Curated annotation (Swiss-Prot):
Reactions this protein catalyses: 2 (2R)-3-phosphoglycerate + 2 H(+) = D-ribulose 1,5-bisphosphate + CO2 + H2O; D-ribulose 1,5-bisphosphate + O2 = 2-phosphoglycolate + (2R)-3-phosphoglycerate + 2 H(+)
Sequence similarity: Belongs to the RuBisCO large chain family. Type I subfamily.
Primary site of residence: plastid
Residues flagged as site, Transition state stabilizer: 334
Protein name listed in UniProt: Ribulose bisphosphate carboxylase large chain
Gene3D superfamilies reported for this sequence: Ribulose bisphosphate carboxylase, large subunit, C-terminal domain, RuBisCO large subunit, N-terminal domain
Modified residues (N-acetylproline): 3
Originating organism: Pinus wallichiana (Himalayan white pine)
UniProt function note: RuBisCO catalyzes two reactions: the carboxylation of D-ribulose 1,5-bisphosphate, the primary event in carbon dioxide fixation, as well as the oxidative fragmentation of the pentose substrate in the photorespiration process. Both reactions occur simultaneously and in competition at the same active site.
Binding-site list for Mg(2+): 201, 203-204
């Protein structure tokens, strides 16, 4: 039987407008194991009290609206409303605080990131009483996460498929990202894979343009993969971007990739959308395809410190929606990413259980139970001199992706790939021997240069290249 609830129909209805905090600010509330918890960074308009702003966020992202309505009496708000249960000031900020909101599980459709985000980060972000609003973190309870398939395969299954263990995987984004014909594109793929890389990759905006239609690209890349595998004896792959203008077209491309026998496809999960991504992830699990995820458009959402949504939330959403790889920044390259913050959401992608750790931006303890993990991909402005730091920061369960750092080699694509493979193997061996890569990394690379002319040439060409700018999004 459903629980007995008191409704307004039985106690009378009083029209009018009242403060949100009278209903939605509940500091005495004890959160439940089944609640979805959210941490919002709230910047209210001048004159709006913290409690009212926090309650407004809880109301407008759950059951509330701007005035009392008669139909409130037909249900139990106490059962379904979001609750602002705690508020804490942000150190160093005069008019900013973290509002903690608890949402009952019944507010959300099972297995739908789309519905989850429509509620929690929907209209409330345009609310006039707030100057800015940012979702910093979500706690997804096992009762909800178990309604999702999650990644198609996960880290261990991918390693077993590739028969590659004990080191990061190596990749390369084919450049120039736009303009190559399909045959020349396939040639670049072959050279990189033959030179020693595990994967090559379509760039995020390579779909099906007049200069290179998707079917032609898929065919030439499959030929390149097969040829490189035959010559090297290693399993190879190319991230064939299945992203398209419709879900039907996306699935058609994924089906063709499977028919070609390639091991992995790719999707732009933010521009493509969570519904499309989840559909593709289900297809990939059912048909043995790995799924690489690009995060194109993420910085529009997550780069500003005061408004939007932190990438750790997008990372959790991706793990639920489904993907075996996702781009996660580099810390040392050309793209935004502070070390502690990056490692915080990298753990949220890979590990089963992550403790609350505010020093790394993790607001809630997260238990993924048995959901497979996602490999973080470090990509963007990295080269051989970064290899020791990348190996030390990301560890074995990662993909290190060098686009310009492979194709920009003065001797060509295959030597560029060889240079990266030698640098990686040298760093892994040094680490396994107990050497400190953070302190001795450059020495490790120089030693490897003595027996690898390809690496020596790469080290010479990129010895002065650095991307040293202040990080915008700090803790």
């Amino acid at each position: 039987m459903s629980p007995k609830t008191e409704t307004k129909a039985s106690v009378g209805f009083k029209a009018g407008v009242k403060d949100y905090r009278l209903t939605y600010y509940t500091p005495e509330y004890q959160t439940k194991d089944t609640d979805i918890l959210a941490a919002f960074r709230v910047t209210p308009q001048p004159g709006v009290p913290a409690e009212e702003a926090g309650a407004a966020v809880a109301a407008e992202s759950s059951t509330g609206t701007w005035t009392t309505v008669w139909t409130d009496g037909l249900t139990s708000l106490d059962r379904y409303k979001g609750r602002c249960y705690d508020i804490e000031p942000v150190p160093g900020e005069e008019n900013q605080f973290i509002a903690y909101v608890a949402y009952p599980l019944d507010l959300f459709e099972e297995g739908s990131v789309t519905n989850l985000f429509t509620s929690i980060v929907g209209n409330v972000f345009g609310f006039k009483a707030l100057r800015a609003l940012r979702l910093e973190d979500l706690r997804i309870p096992p009762a909800y996460s178990k309604t999702f398939q999650g990644p198609p395969h996960g880290i261990q299954v991918e390693r077993d498929k590739l028969n590659k263990y004990g080191r990061p995987l190596l990749g390369c984004t084919i450049k120039p990202k736009l303009g190559l014909s399909a045959k020349n594109y396939g040639r670049a793929v072959y050279e990189c894979l033959r030179g020693g890389l595990d994967f090559t990759k379509d760039d995020e905006n390579v779909n099906s343009q007049p200069f290179m239609r998707w079917r032609d690209r898929f065919v030439f890349c499959a030929e390149a993969i097969n040829k490189a595998q035959a010559e090297t004896g290693e399993i190879k792959g190319h991230y064939l971007n299945a992203t398209a203008g419709t879900c039907e077209e996306m699935m058609k491309r994924a089906v063709f990739a499977r028919e070609l026998g390639v091991p992995i496809v790719m999707h732009d999960y933010l521009t493509g959308g969570f519904t499309a991504n989840t559909s593709l992830a289900h297809y990939c699990r059912d048909n043995g395809l790995l799924l690489h995820i690009h995060r194109a458009m993420h910085a529009v959402i997550d780069r500003q410190r005061n408004h939007g949504m932190h990438f750790r939330v997008l990372a959790k959403a991706l793990r639920m929606s489904g993907g075996d790889h996702v781009h996660a920044g580099t810390v040392v390259g050309k793209l935004e990413g502070e070390r502690d913050v990056t490692l915080g959401f990298v753990d949220l992608l890979r590990d089963d259980f992550i403790e609350k750790d505010r020093s790394r931006g993790v607001y809630f303890t997260q238990d993924w139970v048995s959901m497979p993990g996602v490999l973080p991909v470090a990509s963007g402005g990295i080269h051989v001199w970064h290899m020791p730091a990348l190996t030390e920061i990301f560890g074995d369960d990662s993909v290190l992706q060098f686009g310009g750092g492979t194709l920009g080699h003065p001797w060509g694509n295959a030597p560029g790939a060889a240079a990266n493979r030698v640098a990686l193997e040298a760093c892994v061996q040094a680490r396994n021997e107990g050497r400190d890569l953070a302190r001795e990394g450059n020495e490790v690379i120089r030693e490897a240069c003595k027996w690898s002319p390809e690496l020596a040439a790469a080290c010479e060409i990129w010895k002065e290249i650095k991307f040293e700018f202040d990080v915008i999004d700090r803790l």
